[in-house]
Amino acid sequence: IPAQFNWDHHYADGAHDTSRRMLYTGLKSDTWGTLTFGQQNSVYYDVVGAKTDIWDYDMIGQAPGNGINGDYDGSYRSRQMLKYKKTVGDADIYASYLFEDSEYLPGNGLRYKRKGGGSLGIDYHLTTDLTWGAAWNYTRADMRNPDNGDSKSYDQNILGTALSWTPDNWTFSA
């Protein structure tokens, strides 16, 4: 937005200072649930990652630390994502669709391009302080080498589960 309005000192060509932030909009209804679109936490992160991302925010064992880039491959703050959440009884049910995105240049001469994807997840509240979550994320992407013309399509899948127990002032997660 700052670039579109030429706001001085709020935008620099080529800068990526705010590209890891979230920017999304949505609608919420007590009856129908929540529908959002934009760059936001993925279903996988909401259901699995957030439970274990509590110690020093290192994310080493999480999907964004294993994929090419969490903003592009759908594992963290996914860009161009439509996400739905609905609470039914003791369960929070999630679904998302990842739209095709622009190319990501990882710095090694290759080009990564997400073609699409989606996620499903559930957070089941076993008790008021014990929650079990499971999520699956699928991303279809192309990796291209412009130097030699090589190209390959990938079907990326992430499947994970996490348990969070928060009795009194304590937090345990796995």
Where are these regions (language model features)?
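Outer membrane beta-barrel
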Residues: I1-E100, R114, D123-L126
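Sequence/structural signature of outer-membrane beta-barrel proteins
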Residues: N6-A12, Y44, L98-G116, N137-K152
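Residue-level detector of solvent-exposed, low-hydrophobicity positions
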Residues: K51, Q62-P64, A91, L98, ...
